[in-house]
């Protein structure tokens, strides 16, 4: 009985020594958190292993993450994976679909950055039109009008000008044959007779005012069909047209006229565009075809562009981020108690197994020691 108690006692003592040793060893990984001194001498094993080697551990973890976990090759492979491509395209498609479902307007988007869109856009459009017109006027103010007109437009205008004499005579003939034309001739004849009294008296000895008016009307109508009259009118119109085309731009439109013209053009353009009203309309009502185009074409193309550009610029991005340093700095900011909790949460089973193994090995060693103590 005494022999059995000795063996059991030795086993218990060995188990306690082995188990407590391992428990202390595990605790010494983290504790103490700071260095202790006795008589200005540093107490051995203070601070604990992890607090003492914290910077080295952080550096090694950063190195492992940068060189083996989040490498350029790994990230590029993940970006080009079908699952990543589908996820990016789905996000883009959902964002485009939101434009159709909600009442997002240009102004509501501008409000995010505190911008009055219509006011700003009107100002920019006014400046753009004014600058373009000013540049054109300054560049071509000494250029003949004929050189500013495109050839096809000039040919079209030439054709219209060639028809102008016949058109004028046709309109004049219709007017002279009308009641208003006859009445206007009679009215002008009355005015003439009132101003030229003596001549009227002599004419009225041979003809009445009505017959004189009819004769004048008849001759004027005949004149509209006379070839010589047409030739004279044609020559005058062609000469004036040629003179106008040969004039320089600043001769046809002087500075004052140009400024007035520019103001009219910009005001007309701003009224036509009406950015105030347009900026408060939902985007899908302003450009429905563009939204459909985004859905059918742009979503896939934009996905490819995002992935391609991300892959191309991944190397400089990784260098600028400096993943190793970022991980190291982040770990160094962690509280030691948090690091302890983090490691214990990860390796809890293994640490408990180490402590249990200490009790087990200590007990086995104690058993052998007890047996040896009895029989030796």
Swiss-Prot record:
* Compartments in which it is found: Cell membrane
Q: Say if the entry is tagged with keyword Cell membrane.
A: yes
Decide whether keyword Membrane is in the record: yes
Membrane protein topology class: Multi-pass membrane protein
- What are the UniProt keywords, alphabetically? Cell membrane, Membrane, Transmembrane, Transmembrane helix
Record's Pfam families? DUF445 (PF04286)
Transmembrane stretches, start-end: 4-24, 356-376
A single GO cellular-component term on record: plasma membrane
InterPro entries with a match to the protein in the record:
DUF445, UCP032178
Its family remark reads: Belongs to the UPF0754 family.
Q: What is this protein called?
A: UPF0754 membrane protein SSP0953
